[in-house]
From Swiss-Prot:
Lineage: Bacteria, Pseudomonadati, Spirochaetota, Spirochaetia, Spirochaetales
Compartments, record wording: Cytoplasm
Cysteines joined through disulfide linkages: none
Cofactor(s) listed: Mg(2+)
Entry EC no(s): 3.1.21.10
Cofactor note: Binds 2 Mg(2+) ion per subunit.
Originating species: Borrelia turicatae (strain 91E135)
Keyword annotations from UniProtKB, A to Z: Cytoplasm, DNA damage, DNA recombination, DNA repair, DNA-binding, Endonuclease, Hydrolase, Magnesium, Metal-binding, Nuclease
Entries under SUPFAM superfamilies matching the protein: Ribonuclease H-like
PANTHER family: CROSSOVER JUNCTION ENDODEOXYRIBONUCLEASE RUVC
Keyword set includes Lipid biosynthesis: no
Protein name: Crossover junction endodeoxyribonuclease RuvC
InterPro entries per record: RNaseH-like_sf, RNaseH_sf, X-over_junc_endoDNase_RuvC
Family stated for the protein in its record: Belongs to the RuvC family.
Assembly mode: Homodimer which binds Holliday junction (HJ) DNA. The HJ becomes 2-fold symmetrical on binding to RuvC with unstacked arms; it has a different conformation from HJ DNA in complex with RuvA. In the full resolvosome a probable DNA-RuvA(4)-RuvB(12)-RuvC(2) complex forms which resolves the HJ.
Length: 161
């Protein structure tokens, strides 16, 4: 049985997304991307764009489940608030599309893919490439999309079929 997982790295300016399939203990890369909103847009328009794009991703790729990064302590309150706003729009979109989702902290994600919760972003990308059987020079759409793929792998590791 194949499980298709949508990983989401939320943000107001950039929402990373990644789709992979899991069959047994093997992962297969499907697609990754980034939804970009611009600061000149109103908050309403930014959140609507994020939701609309997530709907298209869900409709096009038909994931079985989603995983999204949980809010963690942030030094910058403004950033934490904007990420929370984007997360709210994304989670509502999951609910409207009847898509189950799970939340993971950055440390859970890093620990799940590497066995160590404090690895650097460059190491995360390296591990993702190995786990997904990618060439070493594969270029992700963005740092956000590679984080989203890590979230999808994390979910697959925590929910073994």
């Amino acid at each position: 049985m194949i499980m298709r997982i949508l990983g989401i790295d939320p943000g107001l300016a950039n929402v990373g997304w990644g789709i992979l399939d899991r069959k047994g203990s093997k992962y297969m890369y499907v697609q990754d991307g980034t939804v970009i909103t611009h600061p000149f847009m109103s908050l309403k328009d930014r959140l609507k764009l994020i939701s609309d794009e997530i709907i298209l991703i869900i409709d096009n790729f038909k994931p079985d489940v989603a995983s999204i990064e949980n809010i963690y302590f942030a030094k910058n309150k403004k950033t934490a608030i904007s990420v929370s706003e984007a997360r709210g729009a994304i989670i509502l979109t999951f609910a409207l599309k009847n898509l189950d989702f799970y939340e993971y902290t950055p440390i859970q994600v890093k620990n799940s893919i590497s066995g160590f919760g404090r690895i650097e972003k460059v190491q995360v990308k390296y591990v993702i490439r190995i786990l997904l059987g990618m060439k070493p020079d594969f270029i992700f759409t963005s740092d956000h999309s590679s984080d989203a793929l890590a979230l999808a792998i994390c979910h697959g590791n925590y929910h073994i079929l």
